[in-house]
Amino acid sequence: MVVPACVLVFCVAVVAGATSEPPGPEQRVVRRAAEVPGPEPSQQEQVAFGSGDTVELSCHPPGGAPTGPTVWAKDGTGLVASHRILVGPQRLQVLNASHEDAGVYSCQHRLTRRVLCHFSVRVTDAPSSGDDEDGEDVAEDTGAPYWTRPERMDKKLLAVPAANTVRFRCPAAGNPTPSISWLKNGKEFRGEHRIGGIKLRHQQWSLVMESVVPSDRGNYTCVVENKFGSIRQTYTLDVLERSPHRPILQAGLPANQTAILGSDVEFHCKVYSDAQPHIQWLKHVEVNGSKVGPDGTPYVTVLKTAGANTTDKELEVLSLHNVTFEDAGEYTCLAGNSIGFSHHSAWLVVLPAEEELMETDEAGSVYAGVLSYGVVFFLFILVVAAVILCRLRSPPKKGLGSPTVHKVSRFPLKRQVSLESNSSMNSNTPLVRIARLSSGEGPVLANVSELELPADPKWELSRTRLTLGKPLGEGCFGQVVMAEAIGIDKDRTAKPVTVAVKMLKDDATDKDLSDLVSEMEMMKMIGKHKNIINLLGACTQGGPLYVLVEYAAKGNLREFLRARRPPGMDYSFDACRLPEEQLTCKDLVSCAYQVARGMEYLASQKCIHRDLAARNVLVTEDNVMKIADFGLARDVHNLDYYKKTTNGRLPVKWMAPEALFDRVYTHQSDVWSFGVLLWEIFTPGGPSPYPGIPVEELFKLLKEGHRMDKPASCTHDLYMIMRECWHAVPSQRPTFKQLVEDLDRILTVTSTDEYLDLSVPFEQYSPGGQDTPSSSSSGDDSVFTHDLLPPGPPSNGGPRT
């Protein structure tokens, strides 16, 4: 039978690690079978496994062609990842298989529900013996196990940063074929003992742990044995916790360079940073004959900066081709992260071609001798004059008295940097300001205006063009007020624009000022996007620091959704009035899509948010979602995760396990938070995530693999996206780019007139079914799910009403 090319896929049942001897009672076997072309949806691949085996099913097309987003189902019901069931885009693993795992498994396209491949899985009582030949006839060279590659096992101590992947190998042989098992600190080590599980590659004699965290530290021992004996090897793993600090630049780089006219030059800059760094190469230039501005800061041009497809390795090298005399000068490597900035500079000297040098050699040697004598004599005269001048000006000595008091007009200062990310490379305007900020010792600023900040021409706004209005709210180190600004709109400079102004409180410290300046500089560096709160300007001269950002008229997303719930809900914002507008499925999907777009942009700029939630998404008058507070400098090591926010919510409920337990923050931990935000969107105006669950119980449930149940107004497809965001292994979660694509497809097929049935009782969200949001519970099945998903939606992939 000829299978059409468009549906041809390869379906693989993987059976690995089989030996000629039955495995011991503690051994776990991964069974593998040869790759075969995938059947049509009506066909099934028959596969048998032994009880206790690790089952691995794979489904992928020939030549690596993408199949699109997929889901796995058992007996027609969607599978959900857990500590025992690992679900990937094209691979399914079931650890410690039992009779309950027998059935028909299928891999389906997530949106079209087209079946890509079928497996009929049978689980028997006897463990698998693999595909090896029957080992009853013992060969002449029978004996105890031995290491086959001992030279690869010399490195017994492994120290890696958190979030890396670690592999331990113990390649061995023997007759009969030995079995391998693993111990951690002398005790049996299994996948359920670790968040994210482990991968046992029996055919490769290896143990793999992805996204390691500090709790993975310890001694790992492989035990290889058969009936003639056993051998073992112990490795020590040390996971280095990431600490917040500004980037560290390798000393001596970039180095000064001397080049011949027309040659090529490379500057190198080695950057070390746990937090994702931004790297830029700058060249110092002259403007109107001066290399510095009126405030003493240098003029520079940005030569190289991060793009969507550039890597840090590429940014660490600046290449100049066919250099000219105009290329000579000072170059700076600038690296920054959410903690601070570092920079090193080097000089390029361009010499004329060799023939020109030969002509000037003779004359140059004569002039050099005369010049050297002249310089020495001139320096001698200067030293004598300086000594005489100092003696004439020194006051007569007095007896012991009160110590001299020196008036300090500025606080002791640290260096900070101001960048403009979207300026032209050929611009001669000052693009970077290396300014001085107050020290971090923390005295109260009696008058913030005494601290002088450098003016940035692109962002500076005169205070006379700003009219402050009513307060909008308070933050951890400042307050936000509404204001009218003239000159923000470049097309209509005389028209006032409503803005939000961030400023410090009266009792602010110099650390608070440093944080506000850092937030402003981070917003400059990240640039503009429709779905983030953008910087509009700043007032840094002649008074306290004002940071002008976009104004969102409808407040944060949580209150926006809450105000639009139908009346009569126990937790509605105001049960006595009708909602402002009724939301449709498409409205909510649009909210999620816009937030995903904003996070995709922030990720492309290598910005990790670390506090993504509905409370930190603002809504404009035109219902545009804008992510806020992405530029805050958060000290993740000193943060009190148990402290409630001003609205009484615990930030821990939005945090990924690796961030919660080990304080490892990556773009993938932001993806977890996005999944919780999705739950908020489709539980409009409802309680906080994990309602009624105490924090201590929440920690336990997350470690056991429990996740929140599907909201009543959420479709199967959207809930599958949530569950993918909540995958225990960070690398298995989707990227924000993938989330944008998935939500775009769902948004396209969603009708504009499908209204949500939001009139669900509050018991839907409270485990105990109490009448008030303050009820507490240890967690019931109504909030968490650990089992299979409900049956899928219709084949068109659109949301159900």
UniProtKB/Swiss-Prot annotation:
Post-translational modification summary for this protein: Autophosphorylated. Binding of FGF family members together with heparan sulfate proteoglycan or heparin promotes receptor dimerization and autophosphorylation on tyrosine residues. Autophosphorylation occurs in trans between the two FGFR molecules present in the dimer. Phosphorylation at Tyr-719 is essential for stimulation of cell proliferation and activation of PIK3R1, STAT1 and MAP kinase signaling. Phosphorylation at Tyr-755 is required for interaction with PIK3R1 and PLCG1.
Biased composition (Acidic residues): 130-140
Disulfide bonds, paired cysteine numbers: C59-C107, C170-C222, C269-C333
Bias type Low complexity, positions: 766-782
EC number: 2.7.10.1
Single annotated GO MF: miRNA binding
Protein name as catalogued: Fibroblast growth factor receptor 3
Organism: Mus musculus (Mouse)
Taxonomic lineage: Eukaryota, Metazoa, Chordata, Craniata, Vertebrata
Gene for this chain: Fgfr3
